[in-house]
From Swiss-Prot:
Source organism of the structure: Pseudomonas putida (strain ATCC 47054 / DSM 6125 / CFBP 8728 / NCIMB 11950 / KT2440)
Lineage: superkingdom: Bacteria
EC main group: transferase
This protein's name: Cobalt-precorrin-5B C(1)-methyltransferase
Enzyme Commission number, as recorded: 2.1.1.195
InterPro entries membership: CbiD, CbiD_sf
Pathway participation: Cofactor biosynthesis; adenosylcobalamin biosynthesis; cob(II)yrinate a,c-diamide from sirohydrochlorin (anaerobic route): step 6/10
Gene that produces this protein: cbiD
Transmembrane regions: none
GO molecular function, one term: cobalt-precorrin-5B C1-methyltransferase activity
Alphabetized Pfam families for the sequence: CbiD (PF01888)
Length: 364
């Protein structure tokens, strides 16, 4: 008899950030230099006080330096760095303090607007603090009065970074060493939302007064074609339109264009901030009501309400000469304007699957 399977899936497993990996490997390398102790695993304390043990792939001396490495375990999160080797090299310095260097596969900041200055290695503030605190605690325990130079590396990081927002943000040469809690929460989307905020910050700091937030590649291509916007002004928001609109309260870029597929824009028009199907759905009767507002007869309203998809509803309206695309964009525009500051000019485009514009509102 075949073994029964559980009706409920097992809980998703959390992982550890690249910042935690860099902390563990830096600590292990420094400990080898100061004590001669070669570890197979090290304990680190995360920002909220939790202690975790991280297994090391190696811990060895290389000339006057030491290096240690660990495999990034992102748990059940679809993280681009899952399984990557993160390793740190540590060198002792005469003067106290801790310096950071971008090693192989770790990027360097080349544009203003991020939390790190131009020219700095892309090792974010919390990982820097974690590494510094662990090394200082070790130094105090060993009576060591000098400093440390920490070089963080990610094997294959330069290629992995091409799958992230780093090139668009002006972080070149590799990945960022990230983490605020030290823990990767599966499907938390926190890193993606942070990259949206960073993209807006970088565009604003570099003097761009017009940005286009797009749901995907087709909408980005449309914005390039319509406005000729450079990469730095194109914000890949995916389903997180709320992350864009709310951030403009802090960073009021003068002109915002929102562009997405007709179905996604229909959800925005209904007041949804998260456009993913897990969190919002297309309300076909509402589309029928909006069509009625601009002249659709009862038969067309019924057909739209009973349509299989939003695209079919749009096609039915188009065949009857009803500009449903423009009406939906107008409702989306009204909702977006209710969220952002009054001084931000907003416009909305809806596109079909081929990237053709099927509706617009607020366009200058």
């Amino acid at each position: 008899m075949r073994e029964e399977t559980r009706e409920q899936p097992a809980p998703l497993r959390s992982g550890l950030t690249t910042g935690s990996c860099a902390t563990a490997t830096s600590l292990a390398a420094a400990k080898l230099l100061l004590t001669g102790q070669r570890n197979d695993a090290v304990d680190i304390t995360l920002p909220k006080g939790k202690v975790v043990q991280m297994r090391l792939e190696f811990c060895r001396l290389i000339g006057e330096c030491a290096e240690a490495g660990t495999l990034k375990d992102a748990g059940d999160d679809p993280d681009v760095t899952h399984g990557a080797l993160v390793y740190s090299q540590v060198r002792l310095l005469v003067e106290p303090g801790i310096g950071f260097v971008a090693g192989s596969g770790v990027g360097t900041v080349t544009r203003p607007g991020l939390v790190l200055a131009v020219g700095e290695p892309a090792i974010n503030p919390v990982p820097r603090r974690m590494i510094s605190e662990h090394l200082q605690h070790l130094a105090d325990a060993c009576g060591y009065l000098g400093g440390f130079e920490v070089t963080v590396n990610v094997q294959g990081g330069e290629q992995l970074a091409l799958k992230t927002m780093n090139p668009r943000l002006g972080i070149l040469g590799g990945l960022s060493i990230l983490g605020t809690s030290g823990i990767v929460r599966p499907f938390s989307c926190a890193a993606y939302i942070a990259s949206i905020h960073q993209g807006i910050d970088v565009a604003h700091t570099n003097g761009y007064t017009h940005i286009a937030a797009c749901t995907g590649n087709a909408s980005e291509d449309t914005m390039r074609r319509v406005y000729g916007l450079p990469e730095i002004a194109l914000i890949e928001m995916g389903d997180f339109v709320g992350a864009v609109l709310k951030h403009l309260r802090k960073v009021p870029v003068p002109r915002l264009t929102l562009c997405g597929g007709f179905g996604k824009i229909s959800k925005l028009a209904a007041g949804h901030m998260d456009l993913h199907s897990r969190h919002s759905s297309i309300d076909l009767p509402q589309l029928a009501g909006w069509a009625a507002d601009i002249g659709a007869d009862e038969a067309l309203q019924a057909a739209i309400s009973g349509a299989n998809t939003s695209q079919q509803a749009l096609a039915l309206a188009h065949a009857a000469g009803i500009a449903l695309g423009d009406a939906v964009c107008a409702h989306a525009l009204a909702f977006a304007r209710s969220v952002v500051p009054a001084q931000v000019h907003v416009e909305v485009f809806a596109i079909d699957r081929q990237g053709g514009i099927v509706g617009q509102a607020g366009v200058q």
